[in-house]
Amino acid sequence: MDVSQFLNNVENDDTLQNIRKEYLNSKRTLQELMTNQSPTKKMEFSKKPTLLQERNSNDYINRNVNSSKPTDDEFLRRQLREGLSRKPEPKISLPSLASDTNRLDSIYSSVNKIDELEKKLYHHELQIQALKNELYQSNASNRALQNKVAELQDSVRMLAALSHSNVKADTDNSQLSANGKWTRHYAGPNSNGNGVYLDRPQSAPSTSSTSEWVANALHDSDDTRVLLGWKQPSSTRVDNSSNFHFPHNQPRNLSNFDDNTSRLIGVTGKTRN
C-alpha cells in the first residue's frame, strides 16, 4: 500500500482532519459573534483600555465589581471624560476678502513708490554725470587759457628785453656820435650791422671825387664779383637813389678796392685790362 494513500485515509490517521474541522468551526463561531454584536459593543471592544490605563483611571476604582459587563452609561461617561481631556484643535481663520484687497493695494502702492524713487535716482545720476562733463570741459579750457597767458607773458618779456637792448644800443650810439668817434651809416646788404661795409675801403680814395666814391661804395659788391669771375657784367644800370650811370664793362682802378679784394684777385691770377 502507498504511503500517501495510507496518510490520506481517515481511518488510519484522523489527526489532520480533526484539526481542520476544529479550525473551521472556531472560525464560523467567531464570525457569528461578530455579526451578532451591536455597533456600540464593537466600538467598546475596539477601544478597550489596557490594564495600566484601567488602574490609573477613576473608572476602574469606582466601577461595580459585581457587574461583569460595562453598561452604556459608563461608556458614555468615559467618552465624555476623554472628550474633555483632549485639547481643542486650533481653528484656522481665513482672511477676509476686504483685507486681501487692502493688502494688495498697499503692496502695489509701495512698488509704485519704489519705481518712482528709482527713476529719480537715475535722473540725478544723469545730472551728476553732465555736471562732471561740464567741469572737465571748464578745467580743460582753464588750462588752455593759462597756457596762452603764459605764452603771452613770455612774449611780453622777450619784447621788453629786445626793447631794452635796442634802447641801450641807441643810447650807446648816440653817446658815440656825440663824442665824434663813430657815425652810424645805412645798414645795407653788405654791412655788418654797425655801419661798416665789408667789401669796400673804410675811407674814400683820394684819387676820385666824392660822388664817384659814393657810387662805387653802393656797387662794390657787384663789381668785386665781376672781377673775380663769379658774375657776368650786365648792361649799364641807373641807380634811382643817386641818379648815377655805372657801365660795368668800363675798366676800373684797383685803388677803389681794399687790400683783401686785391689779394683775392692776385690769388685767382686773373688780370683786368
Curated annotation (Swiss-Prot):
GO cellular component, one term: cytoplasm
UniProt keyword annotations, A-Z: Cytoplasm, Cytoskeleton, Nucleus
InterPro entries for this protein: Spc29 (IPR031392)
Subcellular localization, as worded in the UniProt entry: Nucleus; Cytoplasm, Cytoskeleton, Microtubule organizing center, Spindle pole body
Sections of the chain in a coiled coil: none
Region (Disordered): 38-72, 186-212, 234-258
Gene Ontology biological process terms, A to Z: spindle pole body duplication
Compositional bias ranges of the Polar residues kind: 53-69, 203-212
GO molecular function list: structural constituent of cytoskeleton
Protein role: Component of the spindle pole body (SPB) required for the proper execution of spindle pole body (SPB) duplication. Links the central plaque component SPC42 to the inner plaque component SPC110.
Similarity-based family: Belongs to the SPC29 family.
Name the record gives this protein: Spindle pole component 29
Lineage: Eukaryota, Fungi, Dikarya, Ascomycota, Saccharomycotina
